Amino acid sequence: VERPPVWLMRQAGRYMKSYQNLCEKYPLFRERSENVDLVVEISLQPWKVFKPDGVILFSDILTPLPGMNIPFDIVKGKGPVIYDPLRTAAAVNEVREFVPEEWVPYVGQALNLLRGEVKNEAAVLGFVGAPFTLASYCVEGGSSKNFSKIKRMAFAEPAILHNLLQKFTTSMANYIKYQADNGAQAVQIFDSWATELSPVDFEEFSLPYLKQIVDSVKETHPDLPLILYASGSGGLLERLPLTGVDVVSLDWTVDMAEGRKRLGSNIAVQGNVDPGVLFGSKEFITKRIYDTVQKAGSQGHVLNLGHGIKVGTPEENVAHFFEVAKGIRY
């Protein structure tokens, strides 16, 4: 390749005026993320303006939960709320395996439509939540500051947590395959909360399940690139390639050159510009892009942020980011 491909996490979303306008018309997040036409329209908003190399499905990692018998909602200003947190063996036994065709047909339809829209000008990306992160939401009842409930389960009743993690593992492997069968050309796995675990606990409660997902997907879809993103993963970096994923997405708290060294040469990287950089001057943004690309080298790098675009980011700065990125030549 002559330059690194580029897309941005949360490239569709609240920093865009076109998205804000849509939110006024459709105030409920679940409606915006579960209606085919809206999902396609929102996913394409950044594509129409910036022409990124990757167009990621507009969705949420919790979208499969109702299909697993776990009701949830996303409440404005509060984030995700799981109404009946899973805290007992009996509650976990009620969790069903996820059948995407039955519960989220709009995801498959949206991916197919996105492929038709972007043709071969960009890759269509799908995504799923990782088992430990999904379990964290479901046990905590939503987002958490200290993760004491999931850790109580992990350390006092590990068998219950392993049962839940296994259900999410089987379900997410199926969900990735479903997305690939409907047009996703790469899938990113978000394990946002795995970095709350110590390395030894990551090796028990996250790593084996991620590896199982990757192994299962590679059996049926050997050529589907899988990306793993876990924010704050500096303490776990060397362990991430053991999952078998093709790409590790680094957050900005790890220096790109050091991250590459620590990951080894057999794995591609994605990232890792600090999203806050997009509040800087255009010169500053340019400098940071070049810095990141130089440190990543010319092999196996997807340019991205180290986390999602922040609300309030000036759209013109995002436009500048893409312009500079697409002008790079190795």
From Swiss-Prot:
Pathway in which this enzyme or protein is active: Porphyrin-containing compound metabolism; protoporphyrin-IX biosynthesis; coproporphyrinogen-III from 5-aminolevulinate: step 4/4
This protein's GO CC annotations: chloroplast
GO molecular function per UniProt: uroporphyrinogen decarboxylase activity
Pfam family, one: URO-D
Main localization category: plastid
PROSITE patterns associated with the record: UROD_1, UROD_2
Top enzyme category: lyase
Name under which the protein is recorded: Uroporphyrinogen decarboxylase
Organism (species): Hordeum vulgare
Taxonomic classification: Eukaryota, Viridiplantae, Streptophyta, Embryophyta, Tracheophyta
